[in-house]
Regions:
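Conserved Walker B
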Residues: 10, 314-319, 350
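Conserved ABC ATPase signature
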Residues: 44-48, 257-301, 309, 315-322
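Pre-Walker A-like glycine/lysine-rich segment at the N-terminus of P-loop NTPase domains
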Residues: 2-64
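Short acidic, glycine-rich loop/turn motifs
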Residues: 7, 105-113, 136-138, 270-275, ...
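C-terminal lobe/lid and adjacent interdomain/linker elements of RecA-like ASCE P-loop ATPase modules
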Residues: 4, 326-420
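Electropositive, glycine-dotted interaction segments
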Residues: 115-253
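Conserved P-loop NTP-binding catalytic core
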Residues: 38-40, 46, 60-126
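Extended helical coiled-coil dimerization/tether regions that scaffold
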Residues: 8, 212-285, 396, 404-405, ...
């Protein structure tokens, strides 16, 4: 499970930002808090803020970190590729524009009976990796122990947490643009592979991006084509928000000679109102919301099975607030979410900003100042003008919209359409 994500000098975040999913001592919804080792962890983080405040950059930062962990060994001997994949720093001051960016996570691994906590991170600049570290902490330990540490010079390389044979292989193959974690995973070093696999298991969906919507809508659930039981599960999934779809009919489309991949035509079956027959409607003709929920199913299925993290940008796009709430309740119900999956999402849907749904430490805000610098903060840490913290019985939605918590747009009348 993700405990904490820290990043610095990435896009609009010049200074270090911390997204913390560790549970505070607040008492509301205590039954949803998951205990792993010595950590108490939350299943959800909801991120609010004005348009262009930098909310999506939190999503982008974790996606960047995950992508680099997965594939950094591809850039070791190709500087042009590395240049394309370098993180974008804060560009509005010359110092930050040329400085390194940093990314760090604290997390636990699913199925780890020892219930260790891991701390992994790296710093990267225009030349390559300047620092990288992996630490681990046993369930009963107070301090982290070093698995490896890497600095800028050769004498700042500590691989003491690896077997001797693995150390030699890594030292020989390591290049400046390559992370030890992704190189070690490629070399089948167990600890490195486990960490890389944790990143790979997490899912990302940007519903503000039409390309994401296009490609996700074409991803079919695992076993959907050949397994009628899987199709029935998808029907039951749809029944939680739309009972009109009773079944699916799947037809393989003949190859056109240009592609080797199998493609399918999917029709949704609806019950006729004047008979017991079924009307077939191409899935692509269903509503945008229905298509989005169909696209979400494979990712949701995998996240719940693996106990991984689902990052979603603009979750509310084209979905009714009640449907969004029902989707979130999937993660908040321990009977459904038995593998402790988590969801981190950005949204403008203030109806979910409720003390009937979320804890104060599950609600986050992003605000951008006049210099273009974004700041991330939690409702649990927010202090009002009187110096008081937010009570759990407050109307979060109302207070947010009147500006009590900040992170709302500053609006002016649109006068340009006035007639002279």
């Amino acid at each position: 499970m993700l405990i904490q994500f820290n990043f610095k000098n990435f896009k609009s975040f010049r200074d270090e930002a911390t997204l913390d999913l560790s549970a505070s001592k607040m008492t509301e919804f205590s039954d949803r808090v998951v205990t792993v080792g010595s950590e108490k962890i939350l299943p959800v983080a909801a991120i609010y803020g004005a348009n262009a405040s930098g909310k999506s950059n939190i999503y982008n930062a974790f996606e960047y970190m995950s992508g680099y962990v997965a594939d950094s060994f591809k850039y070791g001997d190709e500087e042009e590729k590395f240049e394309e994949f370098r993180p974008t720093p804060f560009l509005f001051d010359s110092t930050s524009a040329s400085a390194e960016s940093s990314f760090e996570v604290y997390f636990t691994l699913p199925g780890d009976k020892a219930e260790r906590t891991y701390n992994y991170g790296f710093c990267i600049d225009k030349e390559g990796v300047t620092e990288e570290w992996l630490n681990s902490k046993a369930k009963s330990a107070r301090k982290y122990s070093t698995v490896f540490y890497r600095g800028t010079s050769d004498d700042e390389l500590d691989l003491s947490g690896f077997p001797t044979s693995s150390r030699d292989n890594i030292q020989v193959a390591l290049e400046k643009q390559v992370l030890i974690i992704s190189l070690g995973a490629k070399l089948k070093v167990g600890k490195c592979k486990a960490i890389r696999d944790w990143f790979l298991a997490n899912e990302f969906a940007d519903f503000g991006d039409p390309f994401t919507n296009f490609f996700m809508s074409r991803r079919l659930p695992k076993g959907f084509v050949e397994n009628k039981d899987v199709q029935q599960k998808v029907v039951e999934y749809f029944a939680s928000f739309d009972e009109h779809i009773k079944d699916f009919r799947i037809e393989e489309v003949p190859h056109d000679g240009e592609t080797k991949e199998d493609t399918y035509k999917i029709n949704a079956l609806h019950k006729m109102i004047d008979s017991d027959g079924m009307a077939e409607i191409p899935l692509g003709m269903e509503s945008a919301g229905t298509l989005k929920m169909f696209a979400l199913y494979p990712e949701l299925q995998e996240v719940l099975e693996k106990g991984s993290v689902f990052f979603i940008d603009e979750l509310n796009a084209r979905l009714h607030p009640l449907l969004v709430r029902n989707f979130l309740l999937t993660f908040l119900n321990p009977e459904i979410n038995s593998n402790h999956a988590q969801i981190v999402f950005t949204t403008h849907d203030t109806w979910q900003l409720s003390n009937q749904l979320l804890r104060r430490d599950e609600i986050w805000f992003v605000e951008k100042d006049e210099k273009g610098i974004s700041t991330l903060y939690s409702l649990a840490d927010f202090v009002d003008e009187d110096g008081s913290r937010i009570r759990k019985d407050e109307s979060y939605e109302k207070n947010y919209l009147i500006g009590k918590y900040g992170a709302i747009p500053t609006l002016k009348s649109i006068d340009i359409f006035k007639e002279d």
